[in-house]
Amino acid sequence: MAVSWRSWLANEGVKHLCLLIWLSLNVLLFWKTFLLYNQGPEYYYIHQMLGLGLCLSRASASVLNLNCSLILLPMCRTVLAYLRGSQKVPSRRTRRLLDKSKTLHITCGVTICIFSGVHVAAHLVNALNFSVNYSEDFLELNAARYQNEDPRKLLFTTIPGLTGVCMVVVLFLMVTASTYAIRVSNYDIFWYTHNLFFVFYMLLLLHVSGGLLKYQTNVDTHPPGCISLNQTSSQNMSIPDYVSEHFHGSLPRGFSKLEDRYQKTLVKICLEEPKFQAHFPQTWIWISGPLCLYCAERLYRCIRSNKPVTIISVINHPSDVMELRMIKENFKARPGQYIILHCPSVSALENHPFTLTMCPTETKATFGVHFKVVGDWTERFRDLLLPPSSQDSEILPFIHSRNYPKLYIDGPFGSPFEESLNYEVSLCVAGGIGVTPFASILNTLLDDWKPYKLRRLYFIWVCRDIQSFQWFADLLCVLHNKFWQENRPDFVNIQLYLSQTDGIQKIIGEKYHTLNSRLFIGRPRWKLLFDEIAKCNRGKTVGVFCCGPSSISKTLHSLSNRNNSYGTKFEYNKESFS
């Protein structure tokens, strides 16, 4: 499959450029720090004691400082949402780069794990060398109290050692709970362990306050490796002068040859004993800015979300899909954004993100979400919203006497689908419940499509059975009829694909005549679909938006980079629930 460099640069170029910059920063920081501790005169004596372990531990620490600061930035969701909607970021390419924030977070996390391993291994070697190479001449340098002290004591009786062990434990818990299997099977574990990040950062700030590694402060008056002489005031002395002053008898055997060889060599003389000082901690310089920004945002989000919403109605759709309609004072959101729901009656600490399927407008303040009942949290939430006797009913209208649980929302936050209205042509592909991000887009078009750039929308929905799309079919029919009445039949191209055929004719034939010709059995032929779109939109840029299984996502991503003979460029965007 031939690759279109134009599409590849649009989809991958900026991402790979940022990756290259990030990689260069890590390599440069590692190498510069390694050379400093390997060749720096102020680290001469500590390097003599610890060797390569010193260089590796400090170089890896510098990389950890960088990534521990960067990993917090993608988690500042309110800041990212502001930047996405701000006129200060007019470039669509720059806004699309914000969609890679999750990738940056994961990349920095993996890097932290790798270099934490290097850092720990290097310090284990350092602990051994501190014990074995105990210095009688420079007692200030020693971390051990005596020679051949058990290195394990350094790990469990010093602040850097003890905090380091605790950080390794916390990091291990966070990493193992972040695996895909645990996130899918038990999201609670992932959520609770990931909030240990605050403990990790507090330990990190304590970790660097121990001051075990020390550098020399008087390099000018005590050059590294100098010879300490009594009753001399000369800093530099040639070997013959040194010999004539200190050897009055016959020269040591073989010294004449040594004199000839080093005739011009200068021996550095110490004017005073070396002085050592612990490093001023630099980690806080790296992480204080991002950490303060993140904490300030969390405080702002806490204040913003402290007032519960008013639940207007709860709708129980087929296929275990629930719809929740709410109102909150001064709540504003853009199509494609998502919110985080928090129900204390379900879980005191747990929150879950849900894409808005209905956004508030100037004429109506109602907004809503759809969610599929899968997992412990959604099951408990459903049971609180619907009494057991009413869970089989289709619609529960708002009843004043109904005691809904208190529900808090945080957000809204940005997502890639905000850009779907900013293309002239958009291709939206959904798989199963992945259709929810597009619901708000279609509802917005139903209200008023004229303020937006979008003039043609291809909507593809792949479902397992007919019940999966029943709750969404009414909106599709209304939207289709709207554009037909406005004499714009080509504005929305709807294609629905089902893998099971049971009961299709009965349901479709009776209720959704409009969708008869747009319903297909089997899977889409993606290559033919892309060719058709490219042919109908020659020379244009098409936004491709996908929310669904990874198999569909990978196929669309590959086809978006494929070359076509019509000069059409496909820009790929993806949303993921995991």
UniProtKB/Swiss-Prot annotation:
GO terms (molecular function) for this protein are:
heme binding; modified amino acid binding; NAD(P)H oxidase H2O2-forming activity; NADPH oxidase H202-forming activity; protein tyrosine kinase binding; superoxide-generating NAD(P)H oxidase activity; superoxide-generating NADPH oxidase activity
Mediates interaction with TLR4: where is this region? 248-575
Q: How does it assemble?
A: Interacts with, relocalizes and stabilizes CYBA/p22phox. Interacts with TLR4. Interacts with protein disulfide isomerase. Interacts with PPP1R15A. Interacts with LRRC8A; this interaction prevents the ubiquitin-mediated degradation of LRRC8A.
Q: What induces it?
A: Upon brain ischemia it is up-regulated in ischemic tissues and more specially in neocapillaries (at protein level). Up-regulated upon hypoxia.
Q: What does this protein do?
A: NADPH oxidase that catalyzes predominantly the reduction of oxygen to H2O2. Can also catalyze to a smaller extent, the reduction of oxygen to superoxide. May function as an oxygen sensor regulating the KCNK3/TASK-1 potassium channel and HIF1A activity. May regulate insulin signaling cascade. May play a role in apoptosis, bone resorption and lipolysaccharide-mediated activation of NFKB. May produce superoxide in the nucleus and play a role in regulating gene expression upon cell stimulation.
Q: Where is the FAD-binding FR-type domain?
A: 304-419
Any one biological process term the GO annotation gives: heart process
Location(s), subcellular: Cytoplasm; Endoplasmic reticulum membrane; Cell membrane; Cell junction, Focal adhesion
Write out the transmembrane intervals. 17-37, 63-83, 105-125, 155-175, 189-209, 425-445
The record's listing under Pfam families reads: FAD_binding_8, Ferric_reduct, NAD_binding_6
- Please list the cofactors this protein needs: heme
Tissue-by-tissue expression? EXpressed in brain, in all layers of the cerebellum, in pyramidal cells of the Ammon horn and in Purkinje cells (at protein level). Expressed in osteoclasts, leukocytes, kidney, liver and lung.
Which residues does the UniProt record annotate as the domain Ferric oxidoreductase? 58-303
**One term under GO cellular component:** endoplasmic reticulum membrane
Cytoplasmic side, ranges: 1-16, 84-104, 176-188, 446-578
Q: Which organism does this record belong to? A: Mus musculus
Judging by the UniProt lineage, the source's domain of life is Eukaryota
Modification note: N-glycosylation is required for the function.
Which positions are glycosylated? N133, N230
- Residue ranges, annotated region (E-loop): 218-273
> Which regions of this chain are Extracellular-facing, per the record's topological domains?
38-62, 126-154, 210-424
Catalyzed reactions? NADPH + 2 O2 = 2 superoxide + NADP(+) + H(+); NADPH + O2 + H(+) = H2O2 + NADP(+)
- Enumerate the SUPFAM superfamilies for this protein: Ferredoxin reductase-like, C-terminal NADP-linked domain, Riboflavin synthase domain-like
Name listed for the protein in its UniProt record:
NADPH oxidase 4
Q: What class of enzyme is it?
A: oxidoreductase
Q: Report the EC code(s) recorded for this entry.
A: 1.6.3.1
